[in-house]
Amino acid sequence: MDFRIGQGYDVHQLVPGRPLIIGGVTIPYERGLLGHSDADVLLHAITDALFGAAALGDIGRHFSDTDAAFKGADSRVLLRECAARVKAAGFTIQNVDSTVIAQAPKLAPHIDGMRANIAADLGLPLDRVNVKAKTNEKLGYLGRGDGIEAQAAALLVKEGA
């Protein structure tokens, strides 16, 4: 069997005046993530992991942050399109594991909603999608609350291999 593992990463700055959307869930908070799209750091990391596993480049190659068509884009739409492109390249998504690093707000109450959104968008059973939340123990820019980071891993299998 032809298995492929991809790794994804994203980080966005926290700023006032923007909604905080992580994993397709709008989280009540006084700041949100700055970005060309909705800046969903988790979905961007997962999208990168999927494209990487399929050797299809990265999120910027497919959904450029200089393209006006993606201004304010819903990252769930981008994730669904990514999944379609990965499938068109002959791959089946097996599972996704991810970590969000944020000093605040507390993300635990929102994890189930994030997992449900990701599973729905990728057409996966819920038990094949994992989201973890960590702090940075008040160290560095993440610990100061200047931004939020996400990391993801994805496993694909080549159809017919």
Curated annotation (Swiss-Prot):
Its EC number is 4.6.1.12. A divalent metal cation binds at residues 10, 12, 44. Keywords: Isoprene biosynthesis, Lyase, Metal-binding. Disulfide bonds: none annotated. GO terms for biological process: isopentenyl diphosphate biosynthetic process, methylerythritol 4-phosphate pathway; terpenoid biosynthetic process. InterPro entries: MECDP_synthase, MECDP_synthase_CS, MECDP_synthase_sf. Pathway: Isoprenoid biosynthesis; isopentenyl diphosphate biosynthesis via DXP pathway; isopentenyl diphosphate from 1-deoxy-D-xylulose 5-phosphate: step 4/6. The record marks 36, 135 as: Transition state stabilizer. 4-CDP-2-C-methyl-D-erythritol 2-phosphate binds at residues 10-12, 36-37, 58-60, 63-67, 144. GO terms for molecular function: 2-C-methyl-D-erythritol 2,4-cyclodiphosphate synthase activity; metal ion binding. Its cofactor is a divalent metal cation. Binds 1 divalent metal cation per subunit. The keyword Metal-binding applies. It comes from the Bacteria. CDD domains: MECDP_synthase. It catalyses: 4-CDP-2-C-methyl-D-erythritol 2-phosphate = 2-C-methyl-D-erythritol 2,4-cyclic diphosphate + CMP. Homotrimer. Belongs to the IspF family. Involved in the biosynthesis of isopentenyl diphosphate (IPP) and dimethylallyl diphosphate (DMAPP), two major building blocks of isoprenoid compounds. Catalyzes the conversion of 4-diphosphocytidyl-2-C-methyl-D-erythritol 2-phosphate (CDP-ME2P) to 2-C-methyl-D-erythritol 2,4-cyclodiphosphate (ME-CPP) with a corresponding release of cytidine 5-monophosphate (CMP). PANTHER family: 2-C-METHYL-D-ERYTHRITOL 2,4-CYCLODIPHOSPHATE SYNTHASE, CHLOROPLASTIC. This is 2-C-methyl-D-erythritol 2,4-cyclodiphosphate synthase.
